[in-house]
Design a protein with these regions (language model features):
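Short conserved AdoMet
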Residues: 31, 74, 188
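PAS/PAC or PAS-like capping segment
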Residues: 43-44, 94, 168
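GGDEF/GGEEF active-site signature
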Residues: 64-134, 184
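Cyclic nucleotide signaling catalytic output domains
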Residues: 79, 106, 110, 120, ...
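Short acidic/glycine-rich beta-turn/loop cap or linker motifs at sensory/regulatory domain boundaries
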Residues: 44, 188-189
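Heptad-repeat alpha-helical coiled-coil signal-transmission segments
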Residues: 1-4, 8, 169
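Conserved long alpha-helical elements within nucleotide-processing catalytic cores of c-di-GMP signaling
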Residues: 5-37, 44-70, 80-84, 88-89, ...
Length: 190
C-alpha cells in the first residue's frame, strides 16, 4: 500500500509497473494471445553491487537498467519490474524467438554503455530467459513457472546468458524435481 492507502501500482525505484499489473495486462487481452514472447531478465550478481557500492547505488543501477531497457523496447512492447533485480518484457506481436534474442543483445549493449559511462564503478551483466507468450493461455501460474524456469536455466548457463524455453528441458527439470521429492519423502519415512 502507498501513502494514500491504495495498492501501489508503480515501483518507487524504477517507476515501472509491477507484477500484479503485468498479470492484469495478460488477462486484459481481448483476443487470445497468438504470438509474441515474455522475456524474464535479471541482473547477474546484483547483491555484489549492493555489497560493494551500497544500496543507494544499487537502486541507481536498478533505475538505469530499467531506463536502458526502455530505450531498447518498441512501442508494442511493455516492461515491468517483478521483484528485486528482475524485470519482464512483454511482446504480444513478434512471431520469432529470435526477436527476443536480438532484443536481449541490444539491451546488453545498452547496459554496457551505461557501465562505461559510470567509469566501471560496477561491472555487471544481465541474463534472460524467454518463453512463447502463448503459454499465458495455460494460466498465469503455469506461465510464471515456465518463465521463472527459463531465467534459472539462463543463469545456470553462466552470466550474460540468454535461453529460449524448450519443453524438453522443462520436462527433464520436472522429472528431476519429482525424483528429488521422492527421495526426500523416502528419507523422511525412515
Amino acid at each position: 500500500l502507498n501513502e494514500t492507502g491504495n495498492q501501489q501500482r508503480a515501483d518507487n525505484v524504477t517507476g515501472l509497473l509491477g507484477g500484479s499489473e503485468f498479470r492484469a495486462y495478460l488477462y486484459s487481452q481481448k483476443e487470445p494471445i497468438s504470438a509474441g514472447f515474455l522475456m524474464h531478465i535479471s541482473i547477474d550478481d546484483f547483491s555484489g553491487i549492493n555489497s560493494s557500492c551500497g544500496y543507494d547505488y544499487g537502486d541507481y543501477v536498478l533505475k538505469r537498467v530499467a531506463d536502458c531497457m526502455k530505450e531498447c523496447i518498441s512501442d508494442q512492447q511493455r516492461l515491468y519490474r517483478l521483484v528485486g533485480d528482475q524485470y519482464i518484457i512483454v511482446d504480444l506481436r513478434s512471431h520469432s524467438m529470435e526477436d527476443a534474442a536480438q532484443l536481449e543483445k541490444k539491451i546488453s549493449k545498452k547496459i554496457y554503455e551505461f557501465i562505461v559511462s559510470e567509469q566501471y564503478k560496477a561491472v555487471f551483466t544481465v541474463s534472460a530467459g524467454a518463453i512463447d507468450a502463448r503459454f499465458a493461455l495455460e494460466g498465469y501460474e503455469e506461465c510464471r513457472r515456465k518463465f521463472d524456469f527459463s531465467l534459472r536455466y539462463a543463469k545456470a548457463m553462466g552470466k550474460n546468458s540468454f535461453y529460449s524455453f524448450q519443453q524438453e528441458d522443462y520436462n527433464a527439470f520436472l522429472r528431476k524435481e519429482k525424483i528429488i521429492s521422492a527421495l526426500r519423502c523416502s528419507i523422511a519415512e525412515q
